[in-house]
Amino acid sequence: TFDPDNIRYITGFYVTTPMRMVEGQCVFFPVNGEPHLVIADLPARHIPRMPWMEGRIHALLGFYKPTAVDSYDPVLNNYVDWVGGLMAEYGITNEKLALDGTALQMLFADAFHRKGIECIHGKPIMDWARMIKSEDEINIMRIACANAEKAHAAVAAAIRPGVKECDLVAAGIAALYEEGCDHTEDLVCMSGPNTNPYGLTFGDRMIRPGDLVYVDVDGDAFLGYRTCIYRTFCCGKATQEQKDTYQECYDMIYSAIHKIKAGVTDHEVMAEWPDSPHYWGYDTWGEVAPLATGHGIGLTLHDRPFLSCVNRATPGVKPTTLEAGMVICLETWTGKKGGDHGVRLEEMVLVKEDGYEVLSKFPVKELMECWVPYN
């Protein structure tokens, strides 16, 4: 695998952000042995830090991704020869090789085929391996959620007229890095008219009195494990209409959360949500796909399982049964089509044998009013 998150899952090695896209590191994990790691920086730096990988940390074999145009590329074949040699060493040359996490998978498969090695698609194997979290993983995710709560608190404290969406993103990210976050995506921050229709970015719009502001602490990683948690705030006193929209969104998300436990299917959970895209004023599920959805989370922002109204409406898609140890993010949006505001909420939920546990603890039951000088 060349996938940074799967490399970390298998070996504990953290691939830094600049090195992720170039694919200078990979792991070979034999079915009858321990993993071998190729890294793009100095092995001497990491060997003392990773005693569990003793004798199995290898120097860079070259950067094939920027240059390879076909399967005969000599640098690409450095990796093919290295893997082939290890397969021979472990006596597994007749086994299939699962490939994962490279943009040049077709070239690798062709090069391995010439050596008599059959390749298969490896991503689902790793997805399934990571889908159920251990107690250690869950505890790390609790810490990540606590860090996200600090970020949301920093955002709430900063909301006032004149502050821009990008300022709120900066406040949230600063709080995360103060707590040792090792990576984060840019927070989603939409305000006022930007909250309807739903969007997931941020800009330099200035917050004004009466605006709703929704913020997603998404992709914040502690020891690699991520969060994805939306909250909606109001700059000043909220109107009754805004409070009603918020309550509608809260009821929608928690009606689904209350269904969660091991043995329930994703389709049963989604059955708690609107049964037609017309609810939001649209004609097709594709137009409203993000408005009531869910996804697993862990070392990636989007682990299995996926709860998608589009997938559910697609003929032949089978339901997924929830299992204890899954961590799922559920997210909903409400607002009138063509309206001037919208509400977004999201919770991180641990699936348990007898129910669920909401891991995200930042207050959610009522619309939080920020900058209220007239109380």
Task: Give the ranges of each region predicted by the language model.
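Active-site neighborhoods and metal-handling regions in enzymes and metal-associated proteins
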Residues: 1-375
